Amino acid sequence: NTKKENLKTGSLAAIAGGITSVFDMPNNKPSITTKKLFMKKLQKAKGRMHCNYAFYFGAEKDNIEEIKKVEKIRGCCGVKVFVGSSTGTLLVSDQADIERIMKSTKKMISFHSENEDMLITRKKYAKTGRPHSHQVWRNVDTALSSTRKLIKSANKSKKKIHVLHITTAEEIKLLLRNRKYVSFEVTPQHLVLASPDCYKKLGTYAQMNPPIRGVRHRNVLRKTLQKGQIDIIGSDHAPHLKSEKNQIYPNSPSGMPGVQTLLP
């Protein structure tokens, strides 16, 4: 949505935040799930991006042939899989489909890890006008159960994967025991903010997926970072208009800017 940001302004924001290279996600409008759309995005980037860049290709359960077409193109940094639904329409929640994708590409696959079945059944916990209920809806188990399955599939497929924006102490413990095929990242938002204060002060502006959780989880993320055991600090850059974020929860979109504020 270029009303929020475009390739030029996004890359300038990255440079302002001290970032010289960006990997842009495929959950655009439309989602980048075909070679034609990927090439169109690459073409748009020429002469507009002010930093080094590459683009993720969006996986769907039925676009493996498109993945094979795109993976060798210069400018494709990897494949993105949304195991749980988030911002945009991309979703691959069936474990058999996930493993087929793992086996289909030599590119690194990065995962948004939340259990879609649990997100559906727990949606009743997202209370109208109460942004702090976001972490109740998308609770620890929705993330942990998904990440556990991804690790199992990676070990089975012997495929190296990357799990994005880890938020829970339980996931950290699990991931540190399973490093052979799995790398992972955390975001500044989850390292700095914590519930319930963030929701009291920021409301829907603190709403993101996976959600910001309590102090116990934040402290574990910080300690793991201090020990040098976290592979990447990722921005999870997801800007929205104020008019969108000011909507009553849960109609408000999840996500917040990240590249210009990655590190102080």
Please report, for each region that a protein language model flagged, where it lies by residue.
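Short, acidic/polar
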Residues: 3-11, 61-71
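Gly/Ser/Thr-rich active-site loops/lids in small-molecule metabolic enzymes
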Residues: 251-264
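Short beta-alpha connecting loops at secondary-structure transitions
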Residues: 206, 247-252
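Histidine/acidic residue-rich metal-binding segments in metalloenzymes
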Residues: 65-233
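Short, ordered loop/turn segments at secondary-structure junctions
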Residues: 26-28, 58, 84, 114, ...
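Metal-associated gating/positioning segment near the N- to mid-region
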Residues: 1-48
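Short catalytic-loop micro-motif centered on adjacent basic/acidic residues
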Residues: 24, 54-57, 160-165
